[in-house]
């Protein structure tokens, strides 16, 4: 039966007479059937990747590509006068993640299935995700981001598990979402929910009764933690995830012959950041119910579990007040106390304790003590963990520490989102890179081929025009496609330093007003959400939106400079932005970004990186060579030294540098105050002068010089720019998540064995 016949059988009428919605549902059903055919029996050890987030993006096209059906589907629809891209618009994007943590988890699931490794995800079925972002009068507003429909990819099962929270029993319902690999197997993303969730309790944006646990528990990812009820709700969420997940793991392992004593021969559990940390005491508790003594249970769990650290930011290393855990998970506290006592027999260093003198429970400490592996996610990040942030643990357990540099799935971030570049690459080097990303290096043979460089430029031009069309259609913004597309799209956080980009744009505004024109017109595009309670982050958004209005109203400046801020940035938007990018902004304060994966996606699609020596930027620089990347700013050692010395005083930089002072003072100048809100702008102005915790000002001048150099190279040396782009594409192979997952399996998981 051909594809057209399959679709007609499901719709019951000619394709030309079907709506896009009807065709979407038919395609969804075909994908489900074909995915089921690729499910393979599990032998040996199986991975359970537990994560609070899975930012999976829309699934239709990705699944069609991985199943080898994309071209067939597109042609069958085109023959009936239908456009697959229109049908893709019908699909809601799953609201299951927010930033890099969740996107990494999604890439890892793709690579596990592609490499034919048995590995499932475990998480929660959020109804509204983080939030839907909109801008009103230059201010971020948050609303629910619904995505669940009667025909969701996540299928309801009859499997339930009891979960005890604050002395009350809840019933966790399992939903299963098929994860297809590229020419590989089908694995599963297991998502848990409660049948009692009530979406109607949400009001006034994203406000809801945080104490109505039976109604609210899975409504939102990362509920607002600015009050105690919100913080406790996060503990409730985390325990629901790990308790239901642990019961699933034990049930599936037992069904395959596990007697619980040999759990580590059947299951490998990866704890993705600290949100799932309670799986350690929960598994010990459940094994105790199976008759296994505490000491043996600890050994079993330690051998089964591994931990990935994603941050050196103290605020992100979760420390829960003991009172919260006593209230929400009293059944775990005796176990956590025993684990703390056991850890104290291994070291007298109080700073490595699980329960500290202030009665806070350190989740990362529990992870490191009672898993067999702790990994960082980029070479620099891992070295900082070993030598600085987690040095005491490294001295205690040197054998546990290892690095696994993050990666991205090339199926979504090249084949799906940049079909023009994919076709050009296949024409030049064949299609082997689809499965073996290292084959991209073959492109280096064309580094001096003007015809090939010209084709790559034509691809970029077409992608920029496609983005311009999308921006006009979805954001009501018109952009100059001949300008440099300079993009910073990532979570809004001071350490990622969108405020540094802001100050550059103000500086450039002044330069243009003074007649010093840039080498090329610049369109600066931002995509970012700020956490609802993160005031300064929301002020940065307001400042950028206000500056965009000031520039747009100035005909002298707007010919050369434009700011675009994407509303509700998500995976779908990223798939539009990344192929069109010329200059990729990766400007976090050195030592603060664990890895980053946006840098890899932009590089793969032929953008050049403007960045600090932070996270995976270091390894990108090593791969492409310093002549093919724009590096600036302090080193991580210099930054750490400043923090240790405590001698950074932002006001001294403000007073001592006229350009810095002019840019900061513009925030509260006449033009900005006329277009924006004094409260937000003044608060950001004062923050930069009196605090600037992430050292924006010391890097400002170096940033201006390197960014101006990039614009000059783009305008004055187009052939050199094109060559740099080609080298970046060719050297991106190392950053495939297939490589990352193969290393995890080789060193930590040993799946299927």
Predicted regions and their residues:
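A conserved ligand/cofactor-binding region detector
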Residues: 1-753
């Amino acid at each position: 039966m051909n594809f057209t016949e399959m679709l007609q059988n499901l719709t019951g009428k000619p394709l030309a007479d079907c709506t896009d919605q009807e065709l979407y549902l038919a395609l969804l059903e075909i994908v489900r059937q074909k995915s089921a055919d690729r499910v393979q029996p599990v032998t040996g050890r199986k991975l359970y990747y537990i994560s609070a987030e899975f930012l999976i993006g829309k699934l239709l096209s990705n699944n069609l590509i991985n199943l080898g059906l994309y071209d067939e589907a597109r042609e069958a629809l085109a023959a009936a006068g239908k456009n697959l891209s229109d049908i893709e618009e019908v699909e809601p994007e799953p609201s299951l993640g927010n930033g890099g943590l969740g996107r990494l988890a999604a890439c890892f699931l793709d690579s596990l299935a592609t490499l034919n490794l048995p590995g499932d995800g475990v998480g929660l079925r959020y109804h509204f995700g983080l939030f839907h972002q909109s801008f009103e009068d230059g201010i971020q507003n948050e609303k629910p981001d619904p995505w669940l429909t009667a025909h969701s990819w996540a299928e309801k099962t009859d499997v339930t598990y009891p979960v005890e929270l604050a002395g009350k029993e809840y019933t966790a319902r399992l939903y299963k979402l098929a994860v297809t690999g590229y020419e590989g197997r089908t694995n599963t993303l297991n998502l848990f929910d409660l049948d009692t969730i009530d979406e109607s309790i949400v009001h006034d944006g994203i406000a809801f009764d945080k104490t109505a646990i039976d109604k609210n528990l899975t409504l939102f990812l990362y509920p607002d933690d600015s009050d105690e009820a919100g913080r406790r709700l996060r503990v409730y969420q985390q325990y629901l995830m790990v308790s239901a997940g642990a019961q699933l793991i034990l049930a599936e392992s037992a069904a395959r012959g596990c007697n619980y004593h040999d759990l580590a021969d059947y299951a490998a559990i990866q704890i993705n950041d600290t949100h799932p940390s309670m799986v350690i005491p929960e598994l010990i508790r459940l094994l105790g119910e199976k008759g296994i003594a505490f000491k043996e249970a600890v050994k079993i769990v330690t051998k089964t579990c591994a931990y990935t650290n994603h941050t050196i930011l103290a605020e992100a290393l979760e420390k829960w007040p003991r009172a919260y855990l006593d209230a929400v998970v009293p059944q775990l506290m005796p176990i956590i106390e025993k684990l703390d006592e056991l850890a104290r027999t291994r070291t007298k260093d109080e700073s490595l304790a699980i329960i500290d003198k202030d009665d806070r429970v350190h989740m990362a400490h529990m992870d490191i003590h009672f898993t067999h592996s702790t990994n960082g996610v980029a070479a620099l990040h891992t070295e900082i963990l070993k030598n600085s942030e987690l040095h005491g643990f490294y001295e205690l357990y040197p054998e546990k520490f290892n690095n696994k540099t993050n990666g991205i799935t090339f199926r979504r971030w090249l084949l799906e989102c940049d079909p023009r570049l994919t076709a050009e690459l296949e024409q030049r080097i064949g299609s082997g890179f689809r499965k073996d990303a290292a084959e991209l290096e073959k492109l280096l043979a064309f580094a001096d081929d003007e015809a090939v460089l010209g084709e790559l430029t034509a691809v970029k031009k077409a992608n920029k025009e496609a983005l311009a069309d999308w921006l006009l259609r979805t954001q009501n913004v018109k952009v100059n496609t001949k300008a440099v597309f300079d993009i910073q799209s990532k979570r809004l956080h001071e350490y990622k330093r969108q405020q540094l980009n802001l100050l550059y744009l103000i500086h450039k505004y002044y330069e243009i007003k003074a007649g010093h024109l840039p080498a090329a017109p610049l369109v600066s595009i931002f995509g970012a959400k700020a956490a609802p309670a993160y005031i300064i982050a929301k002020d940065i958004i307001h400042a950028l939106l206000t500056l965009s209005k000031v520039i747009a109203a100035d005909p002298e400046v707007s010919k050369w400079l434009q700011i675009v801020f994407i509303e509700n940035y998500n995976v779908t938007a990223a798939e539009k932005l990344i192929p069109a990018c010329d200059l990729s902004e990766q400007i976090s304060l050195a030592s603060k970004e664990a890895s980053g994966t946006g840098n890899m996606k932009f590089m793969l699609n032929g953008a050049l990186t403007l960045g600090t020596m932070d996270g995976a930027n270091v390894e990108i620089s090593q791969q492409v060579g310093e002549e093919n990347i724009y590096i600036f700013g302090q080193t991580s050692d210099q930054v750490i030294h400043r923090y240790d010395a405590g001698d950074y005083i932002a006001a001294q930089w403000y007073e001592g540098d006229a350009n810095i002072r002019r840019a900061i003072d513009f925030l509260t100048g006449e033009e900005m105050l006329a277009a924006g809100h004094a409260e937000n702008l003044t608060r950001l102005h004062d923050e930069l002068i009196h605090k600037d915790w992430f050292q924006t000002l010391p890097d400002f001048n170096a940033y201006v010089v390197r960014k101006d150099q990039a614009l000059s190279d783009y305008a004055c040396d187009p052939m050199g720019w094109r060559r740099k782009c080609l080298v970046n594409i060719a050297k991106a192979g190392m950053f495939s998540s297939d490589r990352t997952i193969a290393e995890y399996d080789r060193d930590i998981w040993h799946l299927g064995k």
